Curated annotation (Swiss-Prot):
Residues 1-23 are annotated as: Disordered. The lineage of its organism: Bacteria, Pseudomonadati, Pseudomonadota, Alphaproteobacteria, Rickettsiales. Keywords: Ribonucleoprotein, Ribosomal protein. This is Large ribosomal subunit protein bL32. Gene3D superfamilies: Single helix bin.
Length: 60
C-alpha cells in the first residue's frame, strides 16, 4: 500500500486544495424575456438565441 514518506505540511496541503473551491454559476439575462437563465439553455418562453424552438400545438 502506498504511504507518504514524509508528512505533508499545512501549507502544501492547503496549496493542493486551492482548486477545490465551489465556483458560482454563470447566469445571463435572456434577450427575449429579460429573465435570468443559464447560458446555452432554452428560455422559459421556449426560445433560444431569439428564435422559437418548440411551438405548442393546439389539442383537438
Amino acid at each position: 500500500m502506498a504511504v507518504p514518506k514524509r508528512k505533508k505540511s499545512k501549507s502544501r496541503r492547503n496549496m493542493h486544495r486551492s482548486h477545490h473551491a465551489i465556483k458560482p454559476k454563470n447566469i445571463v439575462v435572456c434577450a427575449t424575456t429579460g429573465e435570468f437563465m443559464l447560458p446555452h439553455n432554452i428560455a422559459v418562453d421556449n426560445s433560444y438565441k431569439g428564435k422559437r424552438v418548440f411551438i405548442k400545438q393546439k389539442a383537438e
